[in-house]
């Protein structure tokens, strides 16, 4: 096996936030529409902390930051996505044992709480943000560990009131990605399951039929799709512990 050696240099101001942050994930994008990439950080996991935005000053330094919202959360994800098709990035937050949240962007990188979605008891570990019903709007697939997984369809205004259960109520799902696995023109959902449960692929647009993949006790934490052998088909990379 041959690899390519690439050296990375430490950034002189390479640390973000404080030492006591229990960060679970980051999402990057141009939050304030100034042409550079900013960072949203999900903090807390099982313990409530404030999620945070770090603004790029244009030279790769992140001296300015803001909290997302006015209360601490048990967050696993703070994903940047244009949820209401207004050409700016909003934030969708996945929480553990708390309802998930949507924060709308005013176009200048200022965020206002907009709505909750999901159930209070959901142990959300992951969110897949994709147009699952091919109507031009971003929908949400919710990965809930040891509770029911749900799909929330966007009504075109960034509202998610249509709740659709999929899979088994006991699936210990950690991560979901969308890909047209069988190339039928519909996105499918690829699930990473832990607790010695086999990973699954649910076929769209109904997300009822599924197949297994993996060894059955992989303890998968994340899945990624890419055309690894350049044959025109998405392959799956599973990250296991």
Task: List the model feature ranges, each with a label.
Residues 24-33, 76-85, 104, 125-134, ...:
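Beta-propeller blade termini
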Residues 34, 38, 86, 90, ...:
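Acidic carboxylate motifs that coordinate Ca2+ or other divalent cations, activating on Asp/Glu
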Residues 16-33, 39-41:
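Beta-strand-rich domains and repeat architectures in extracellular enzymes and scaffolds
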């Amino acid at each position: 096996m041959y690899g390519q050696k690439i050296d990375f240099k430490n950034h002189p101001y390479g640390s973000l936030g404080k030492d006591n942050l229990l960060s679970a994930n980051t999402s990057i994008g141009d939050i304030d529409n100034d042409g550079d990439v900013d960072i949203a950080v999900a903090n807390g996991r099982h313990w409530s902390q404030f999620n945070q935005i770090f603004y790029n000053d244009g030279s790769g330094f992140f001296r300015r930051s803001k909290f997302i919202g006015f209360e601490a959360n048990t967050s696993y994800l703070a994903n940047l996505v244009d949820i209401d098709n207004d050409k700016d990035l909003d934030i969708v937050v996945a929480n553990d044992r708390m309802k998930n949240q949507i924060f709308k962007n005013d176009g200048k990188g200022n965020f206002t709480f907009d709505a909750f979605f999901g159930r209070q008891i959901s142990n959300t570990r992951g969110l897949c943000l994709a147009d699952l019903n091919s109507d031009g709007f971003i929908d949400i697939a919710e990965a809930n560990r040891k509770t029911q997984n749900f799909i929330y369809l966007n009504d075109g205004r960034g509202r998610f009131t249509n709740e659709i259960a999929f899979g088994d109520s006991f699936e210990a799902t950690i991560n979901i990605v969308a890909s047209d696995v069988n190339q039928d023109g519909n996105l499918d959902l690829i699930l990473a399951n832990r607790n010695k449960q086999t990973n699954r692929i649910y076929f769209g647009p109904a997300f009822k039929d599924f197949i297994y993949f993996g060894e059955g006790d992989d303890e998968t934490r994340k899945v990624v799709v890419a055309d690894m052998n350049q044959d025109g088909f998405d392959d799956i990379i599973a990250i296991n512990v």
